[in-house]
Amino acid sequence: MGKLLLWVGLLLMLKHHDGAAHKLVCYFTNWAFSRPGSASILPRDLDPFLCTHLVFAFASMNNNQIVPKDPLDEKILYPEFNKLKERNRGLKTLLSVGGWNFGTSRFTKMLSTFSNRERFVKSVIALLRTHGFDGLDLFFLYPGLRGSPARDRWTFVFLLEELLQAFKNEAQLTMRPRLLLSAAVSGDPHVIQKAYDARLLGRLLDFISVLSYDLHGSWEKVTGHNSPLFSLPGDPKSSAYAMSYWRQLGVPPEKLLMGLPTYGRTFHLLRASQNELGAGAAGPASPGKYTKQAGFLAYYEVCSFVQRAKKRWINDQYVPYAFKGKEWVGYDDAISFGYKAFFIKREHFGGAMVWTLDLDDFRGNFCGTGPFPLAHTLNNLLVNDEFSSTPSPKFWFSTAVNSSRIGPEMPTMTRDLTTGLGILPLGGEAVATETHRKSATMTTTPRGETATPTRTPLSSGRRTAAPEGKTESPGEKPLTSVGRLAVSPGGIAVGPVHLQIGQKVTPPGRKAGVPEKVTIPSGKMTVTPDGRAETLERL
């Protein structure tokens, strides 16, 4: 009864903390229908009231024009996807172009000249309006990396400005609402510094989805969690760190959405007896029955796995993992999603992004908690103004909630990144080719060189706890509040920070290290980082 009352109190506090609804942006992939059996899903199976924005992934590009990736998209999936708005008039739909398998070469070619970009912009407006989408999402992974030249960091900004201006002009001419413009961006500080001018992206985009997952996986030599909320000493990668980093670079927090994964990353343990966080590992665990991708399990596959596995809770990172024999998976559940929703509210971010609805237990057949249990958790905590009829997840917060944030000085990134940098593809995108999307052809994308810093394995005696708060170390009492110590790549220790309920959080006031005299061509003008405009001839 005590925990139930605490849950109700937390839910009320979350819903009324800032008096404003948050965005819940949910992706749906166009290869989800080709998964076998009960893992197959079509747009008609989605709940139109679950998310504030639905994003269809992905469109493709041909001859500098946006095009459907598959003929079935235009004939079946687009109409079904946008027909959901007939049931929920407030729902917004966007079409995403790009993705990991898309690569960078077509983006680079399109960005290289004004005429190529103009051709792309015109095709975008035509395709979106023809099929009834409300906006465009750019999933360019990543400007200036993976074979993309360094200049793409700036030509990408040109494209954003030209898209935004064209959307405004089209809205004025047609008297229709302006098309939305968003982008998915990396949550890795090393990639962020190479790929983006964060402050300009913050000015030009309606919202930004931070890919704060795939932070650890089977490409590493020790186990690590896919999407931890907080950082560990010596390992700054976390959702909180990624969000705070983007904010520190000058992006308005209300435009930043935390990416939450509905899947887990797996490892094959070197020894079954050493199964803690930081244990030695050699490659991925077995592929899932439905997703068929090594090192990866959809949430509905995780639910099947944990029924026969041992579960643990990482106190310092507010996320669970499970293991059975030599198989290990770090994943998110309704409890960890709840903690992340609390962090989003406390830090006044714009909301959450979910990758993807088709990896959640969308029919409720596997996890026993109803359809879309993870997305429903976020909907209840971030979107709805009143209690939903959907059963609430069972988890509990202490009155002291911890926050990890960037220190007063931005860390200096010294690690050199090359265009050959190997970065893991986003979760679930394991399609072998553009034209063959059946599950039988799905393979794991080659990873090449790892982008993650070398991690120091944690001691095998590290304390862990089950989700109910019971520690696994002998003789220890359940923890209700854990201090936070986050260490930046520059060695800056941050924390511990304890936020009490009702305490006001002041965003970092120091501006990021943006060059003072570098000018960025923008339309017919050059925009300096401080916002001043000067006339300059354009590319």
Curated annotation (Swiss-Prot):
Residues 1-21 form the signal peptide. PROSITE patterns: GH18_2. Belongs to the glycosyl hydrolase 18 family. SUPFAM superfamilies: (Trans)glycosidases (SSF51445), Chitinase insertion domain (SSF54556). Oviduct. It is found in: Cytoplasmic vesicle, Secretory vesicle. Residues 440-457 have a biased composition (Low complexity). Chitin binds at residues 71-72, 98-101, 142, 211-214, 355. It comes from the Eukaryota. It comes from Ovis aries (Sheep). SMART domains: Glyco_18. Gene3D superfamilies: 3.10.50.10, Glycosidases. Glycans are attached at residue 402. Binds to oocyte zona pellucida in vivo. May play a role in the fertilization process and/or early embryonic development. This is Oviduct-specific glycoprotein. Residues 433-480, 503-539 are annotated as: Disordered.
